[in-house]
Amino acid sequence: MKLLITGGHLAPALALIEEIEKTKKNIDIVFVGRKYPIDREKTLSLEYKEINKKNLTFVSLEAGRLTRVISVSSLIGIFKIPIGFLKAFFVVNKYRPSHIMSFGGYLALPIVFWGYIFKIPVFTHEQTIKPGLANKLISFFSKKIFVSFDEVKNNFPANKTYVSGNPVKPSIFKIWKKPFEIKKDRPVIYITGGSLGSHSINMHIKKIIVSLLHRYIVIHQTGDTKEYHDFEDLLNIKNQLPKELQSRYFLVKHFFDDQIGYIYS
């Protein structure tokens, strides 16, 4: 059996892979994702690093998408939509998976479309409370749709939608590696915008980090998007703080699977 996994939500995808590796030894997994998080950058994406650590097949795919904001980059994205569909055809045709599991997003849409055309069973998972346009389109081609929350069901056809919850990696309940040592003498706040980070969250934290550090230990996962230089800007802010406050501020670009358990411990 060959399973092709694709989509924008990395954490539940990794949780599924971890469960498959533990219980199903005869499944060949192919992961279709972005090698670089943003087209203009050459920083390797977290999904590429994680999948390669697991020695699984990683196929890089670039695809365009529709956005609500009109700009030069959004227009380029529109022109890349047919190119993405063409590339996705060759991916699906080459690997011919027996099943496709989508975790949503613009990258998954062309893969799911061709899976449907090739009569490959497609399944999708919606992680968030408000489905995006891509997942609404993907739902049409899907045999079954899994959602994290009961209130999301109304966004999809009732006859093939199931509340599964959000897949969670068992690794977060175990301490495999300590990325740093925390002296837990006060409450801990973990700030994250997901694998890519969140520029808007990072911008807000820049304004309030000093006041937070007077009362809390802060673990801040910024992401590694070179377009905004958030990690570098926040590192500069940290270096200008008094030593006592610096010792309470743990700044990282991202955490790997074997590190996240310590954060939640």
Question: Model-predicted segments: where are they?
Answer:
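Conserved nucleotide-sugar phosphate-binding/catalytic loop shared by glycosyltransferases and other
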Residues: 5, 26-76
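Short amphipathic alpha-helix
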Residues: 10-22
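Glycosyltransferases and closely related glycan-assembly transferases
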Residues: 21-22, 49, 86-100, 107-123, ...
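Donor-nucleotide binding loops and adjacent catalytic segments primarily
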Residues: 37-42, 177, 182-265
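Short, polar loop motifs at secondary-structure junctions
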Residues: 46, 147-154, 223-226, 238-239
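An amphipathic, basic-hydrophobic alpha-helix
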Residues: 63-99
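Short acidic active-site motifs
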Residues: 87, 132-134, 258-262
